[in-house]
Amino acid sequence: CHITQPVPCVALCPAGVDIPGYMALVGEGRCADAVRLIRKDNPFPTACAYICEHPCESRCRRNMLDNSINIRGIKRVAVDMAGYVPAPACPTSTGKRIAIIGGGPSGLSAAYYLQLMGHQTTVFEKRKKLGGMLLYGIPSYRLPRERLQDDINVILETGVEVRLETSVGNEPGQLSLEELRKEYDAIYIAIGAHSDKKIGIEGEDAGGVISAVEFLRAIGDGKYPDLSGKKVCVIGGGNVAMDAARTALRLGAEVHIVYRRSEAELPARVEEVHHAKEEGVEFQNLCNPVEILGDENGRVNGLKCIRMELGEPDESGRRRPVAVPDSEFVLDVDTVIMAIGTSPNPLISGTTKGLDTNRWGCLVVNEEMATTKDKVYAGGDAVTGAATVILAMGAGKTAAVSI
């Protein structure tokens, strides 16, 4: 594949990992060297071996003959066979200090590569553990916690300083961005997109309604609700909706997914939809929620929906769902999980002058990941909105190089 420049699969990898290179190393049985090569562009080889969206496979040259190479699967072979591979030695300190706000995949990626350049990084994370959405958004049946920790441990080996349960904002007890700008040579904001969007229907505040982010975050904290015998409806059709539905299923619930378009328009990856169906999740496609019904105690006891049909394409290119007259029906549920998307938390941007955001509340950056405020960079979901893990990791590496 190296005779083709740029290599198609590498060109489509947001982190720019040398895929043909580590394929060759695994083929030679040099799995530890393969892991080292992956880490040159992606400090989460183990996590990505489990949950990467593998866009590279769609451009694999093998597709010209039959099917793509199972790139993610071979990465899994590399990390499993290699076992523990220590972090490379860091160079002499440059004396520069970088503050990183957010201990998720983007923030930790930036910290790792900055440390390897000789700069001292400090990660400020508001929760009790590092990992961000890798820990609090992806269920353990997809990414075992001990395997995620393997990657984090190697990142920490480079000398990253960590301050857990530390928030940045303007509330009492929080650090301000201006304080950090005075103390550090640069700042990288990687706070993700964890603010839930509202669907805007009656009954949304009833007892038994929870956001998918909140639900999965509780699971990540080790708090497992008893859903035995419960009838759960997940509203939404993305990967987060699939994760929430499959998690609820494992906790004993009967689970339905309600999505307003057809199955062909589901934004979730095909493999995630397949797994959800295989495990027993019921799909109510071409249905739109109209009202969440409640009992005399204010708790959910039904979801009123209306049938939809597809009309003309909208601005996204997908056919617009149109309500079918007189087609309302009630779905018998007692728990509703909202999975209709998230947006960046405005805590930092809303309290810091000179930090521009776009109409979706995402931080505005240039091609070097620099924001509109001097010495402040940003990346990951805080810039793109909710996106993929590998895209966030790639942004962290790009920001590190720019800084």
Give the residues covered by each predicted segment.
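Rossmann-like dinucleotide-binding cores of NAD(P)H-dependent redox enzymes
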Residues: 123, 127-162, 245-291
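A conserved FAD-binding loop/helix module that cradles the flavin
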Residues: 244, 382-403
